[in-house]
Amino acid sequence: MGGISIWQLLIVALIVILLFGTKKLRSLGGDLGGAVKGFKNAMTPEDENKSLDDKEKDQTAATSQQAAEKQPETESKDKQA
């Protein structure tokens, strides 16, 4: 009775999405994820950092490649509207 129900959380989430928009929330999530990765890298020992850096470079390259592939689709949709 005193707690927050799932419906109240959904309504709050909907209001936040309407206020800020999905693009701003997506960029905020990306920034938060980068901060968490940086914190994890700072907390791991140096020898593990080297292998983690290599993995991150691979992930970053794959992510940027996927973003480049999706980029023309969104631009063409914006031009049509």
Swiss-Prot record:
Residues 34-81 are annotated as: Disordered. Keywords: Cell inner membrane, Cell membrane, Membrane, Protein transport, Translocation, Transmembrane, Transmembrane helix, Transport. Residues 47-59, 70-81 have a biased composition (Basic and acidic residues). The chain crosses the membrane at residues 1-21. It comes from the Bacteria. Its main location: membrane. One of its GO terms (molecular function) is protein transmembrane transporter activity. GO terms for cellular component: TAT protein transport complex. Pfam families: TatA_B_E (PF02416). InterPro entries: TatA/B/E, TatA/E. The keyword rRNA-binding does not apply. It is found in: Cell inner membrane. The keyword Transferase does not apply. It is a single-pass membrane protein. One of its GO terms (biological process) is protein transport by the Tat complex. HAMAP family: TatA_E. Belongs to the TatA/E family. The Tat system comprises two distinct complexes: a TatABC complex, containing multiple copies of TatA, TatB and TatC subunits, and a separate TatA complex, containing only TatA subunits. Substrates initially bind to the TatABC complex, which probably triggers association of the separate TatA complex to form the active translocon. PANTHER family: SEC-INDEPENDENT PROTEIN TRANSLOCASE PROTEIN TATA (PTHR42982:SF1). Part of the twin-arginine translocation (Tat) system that transports large folded proteins containing a characteristic twin-arginine motif in their signal peptide across membranes. TatA could form the protein-conducting channel of the Tat system. This is Sec-independent protein translocase protein TatA. It comes from Shewanella frigidimarina (strain NCIMB 400). The gene is tatA.
